[in-house]
UniProtKB/Swiss-Prot annotation:
<comment type="function">
    <text>Component of the RIX1 complex required for processing of ITS2 sequences from 35S pre-rRNA and the nucleoplasmic transit of the pre-60S ribosomal subunits. Regulates pre-60S association of the critical remodeling factor MDN1.</text>
</comment>
<feature type="compositionally biased region" description="Low complexity">
    <location>
        <begin position="456"/>
        <end position="479"/>
    </location>
</feature>
<feature type="region of interest" description="Disordered">
    <location>
        <begin position="715"/>
        <end position="769"/>
    </location>
</feature>
<keyword id="KW-0698">rRNA processing</keyword>
<protein>
    <recommendedName>
        <fullName>Pre-rRNA-processing protein RIX1</fullName>
    </recommendedName>
</protein>
<dbReference type="Pfam" id="PF08167">
    <property type="entry name" value="RIX1"/>
</dbReference>
<feature type="region of interest" description="Disordered">
    <location>
        <begin position="456"/>
        <end position="488"/>
    </location>
</feature>
<feature type="compositionally biased region" description="Low complexity">
    <location>
        <begin position="722"/>
        <end position="741"/>
    </location>
</feature>
<dbReference type="GO" id="GO:0005634">
    <property type="term" value="C:nucleus"/>
</dbReference>
<dbReference type="GO" id="GO:0006364">
    <property type="term" value="P:rRNA processing"/>
</dbReference>
<dbReference type="InterPro" id="IPR012583">
    <property type="entry name" value="RIX1_N"/>
</dbReference>
<keyword id="KW-0690">Ribosome biogenesis</keyword>
<comment type="subunit">
    <text>Component of the RIX1 complex, composed of IPI1, RIX1/IPI2 and IPI3 in a 1:2:2 stoichiometry. The complex interacts (via RIX1) with MDN1 (via its hexameric AAA ATPase ring) and the pre-60S ribosome particles.</text>
</comment>
<keyword id="KW-0539">Nucleus</keyword>
<feature type="compositionally biased region" description="Acidic residues">
    <location>
        <begin position="742"/>
        <end position="769"/>
    </location>
</feature>
<comment type="similarity">
    <text>Belongs to the RIX1/PELP1 family.</text>
</comment>
Amino acid sequence: MSINIVLEEIKGTPSSIIPLLSILHNDKQILSTITKTELNHLISRTLNLVRSSDVYNKWCGINLIRVIVEEYSILASEGNNLMNSLLQVLEAYQQQQHHHHHQTTIDLKILTSCIETINYMGDLIRGKPTLTREILTPKLNSIIGYYFQYLHFAPLLILNSLQTLLKFHPTTFRPFGNKLKTKLINLIDGGGGEEFINYPQDLQLSIYNTLAMLPIIEKIEPETKWYNDVINILGEINGLIQIYQEFLNFKDDQDLSNLIQKLPNRPTTTTTTTKLLTDLSIDFNKPQTILSISNHLNILMGVLKSYLTVETLFTVKLPLGLILTTCELICSINTKFLSFKGDIRDETIKKLIKFSLIENYKTTLGVLIELIELYKGSLIPHLTTIWSFLETLIPFQNQNKRIVNEEIIESESLYVEILQFMKQSLSLLGNVSENTQLLRFVDMALILVEPRINPTTTTTTTNNNNNNNNTKQTNVQQGKKQKKRKNTSSVALSDILSHEHLFMTNIPTITITTVRSFINQIITKIILPPTQHYKIMRYLIIESIHAKYYNLYHNVPIELKKLLINAVLYPGYDKISILPIISTILSDDPLLGVFNNPKFPPLPKYINLVNNIEEEEQKEEQEEDAIIEDEVEEPIKEELTTPLKKRKLDIESNEETDNNNIIPVEDQSKIFTATKVEKLTTTTTSSIENNPVVIEELTSSKEIVVESPVDEPTKVDNIIPTTTTTTTTTTSLTSNTANANDDNDNDDDDESSDFEMPEINLDQDSDDE
């Protein structure tokens, strides 16, 4: 689409501006390729629309500015002119006179469009130093002033805009800080807070957030200003709560007085701090004024909540202990533990006081939920204390400590918020070892999801039965004969017995969702006693069957499906498995299929490490013994198989010693198999004579006579050779191993020789001498 079509359309009153705005917004090429002449025509015709007295033309011109400033080149070159035209709309439009009523009016559509466009241009300019310095900063004072002036026309939009200016331009906003705070307090305290409580929730929240952001404009120590504001709010809450001393006996609970002493005092008129709310005036002749206590507490806790949640540009010190003490103080004011004073006799006033306390509990739960959502793990050390004072809010009978179902249903929203806080607090924990503190919350949750019969139906049935009984008693007393007539009153009541499901009331969706989420946390985090466990299992099974077979697709809701699977994964003390029932309900679930048809891997073979080590040691010892035996047996076998050779060599060695000649050892491998002998010397004749080796005398024919036959060899224990070595008689196996490579040439001779040099026993010789 060409830019000429757009220029032609906005030349006068546009017939339809929406397609043009859509095209310019989506097709960025149109504005990025625009020529200088076309840009001048576009800007001039847009400004003509903005200056037009016609509301439609003005609205078209304002929204056209919002679209064309998306192109940076247009924003940089024409942003100043466009911003001035928008400010002129804010300045001059309220002076327009309404033609019919002649009143000063302002069109909200033009106002909101103009403010939104200014905010949009500010967001585009902010962060770009040159544009901010040239366009935005010089006009901030005018923008803030106009926003203050039109605050009552569009409070929500203008307050959100002021929050943005506070955050990004605190220095420029500083002169307007006190003025804005005064305006906000007037809005809050208007009509004693009775008017403010009827504002929309989003507008109330915007006022709270704007008030909480004001410390950001402080030049010196803004964090101190923030902390002092929080302390003043807590002190104002403390003073407000003490009003209940006029109705209840605080002396019945000593801990209550201790909590009051821990909190800061209420700001007085002599202090420099400004109170948010004025003093209350309660008149027993106007019981509804009692509810103003709850309204004021709601406002103060709302401001406190905003101080805790709104982001700041500086680090603050959060008085978490004082905040939790304030919550405990509010929840401790309970008519179950505190008696009414003697002058409070009217039941209406008592009911209003109880209702006011319940509203206070709801407000406190809102702050606790915000705290645990924002600060999470920081509240874990305080969870036991919080659970304790929340448990006191559950109504129960003093005799048997049973929970009162009627009061639970009447204040359903309060107990739903309690369960919501419990769910979020349990989600922060991995496991809860002590479950006694949570049992009442479980019972309360199950009461909230029990089937409910319309209370008016049961009341009608009871009243009719009482009337019938009274009529019978009257007739008997008067002696009248009762006529048999049809009981018409029982006809309609018979439907209650036959079609009870038609008289059931629906449980709110938020209640069901909260209870199921709480039960899911309970199942996975703690082990319940059998009573509570079976109650939960019964509820889950009934709800799942009802949900599956009473809908079109026969599907179980996701939240119930998770609950059923967790019930299988975390059985607790359950002795009887509910897996068959749940498998029937969730027949196609793959996780339950693993439980029903397990495919286990091969069982591991457990090995006793101690026995294994002992067996290995025994095997090693046996192998070593076998090696030693083989080494010992081999030379013995060789000696026994060749006794003739040994004896012949002994005789030859004796003859050689007589000549006292040194015999060089040429073939060492034939003499020693395990050692290497480098040098061999002869011994003296006397040592040879003492040698215990028995040698038979040689006959003339020089035949050797052997005493024992060869077939039956005897073991020779000690054979002492006739030769000794001068250097080393027997070298170690290490030397033999080291020189093994040198003796490779003699390996063939060793294999053919069976002789081994016996060990020389020198001790034997010395004894014989």
